[in-house]
């Protein structure tokens, strides 16, 4: 777990506090534009093994079920995974970008409610993509793949986050972009705001309370004025 500080008490007053005591954020596809890079790294790795990875297969296996597409190849899985991971970090170093609207949204919400990141991304990859993002100081702690046994769509990541925060899941909001992430948060008892990206459109988001077109809609939904909190 990556921790900046313990959760502070919630800010008194305001519509959002009446609804929620904390906000948990997915990373890839919500904060950072990286899922197309992960697809590229997996496709290139599988091509080395003579397997063609289509976007539809990637969406079904990785983004919806949360399973590894490398299982499509036979042979030395660890060698293929190692090559894929190295290639992915190269792509992250060169091309990972903060999704438009994220910085402004976090500036508005920071200090209003406790916030944390709950991601299936491995810690090394997470830190690589955030080297220059400027986002991490907005969060009280971060859970990466190494911090729990079962990944999304299992509810364990969000249950672990609520336990770490000392918060009732029913009083927390999760912000997700994928079917597996929405499923994980809903199964853990959180309210979910879904912001499907291009690679996740067409998924089952029926358990999300809200379906947003842009992250910039979130502050207004929570009753904030959209101005950075001081």
Language-model-derived ranges and their functions:
Residues 63, 122-123:
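Short "lid" loop at the C-terminus of a central beta-strand within the Rossmann-like core
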Residues 2-20, 103, 107, 123-230:
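Asp-based, Mg2+/Mn2+-dependent phosphohydrolase catalytic module
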Residues 18-107, 111:
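N-terminal helical cap/lid subdomain that shapes the substrate entry/recognition surface
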Residues 91-96, 120, 188-189:
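Short, flexible loop segments at the rims of nucleotide/cofactor-binding pockets, characterized by
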Residues 30, 119-121:
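Conserved phosphate-coupling serine/threonine residues in phosphotransfer and NTP-handling enzymes
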Residues 112-113, 189:
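Glycine-centered short loops/turns at secondary-structure junctions
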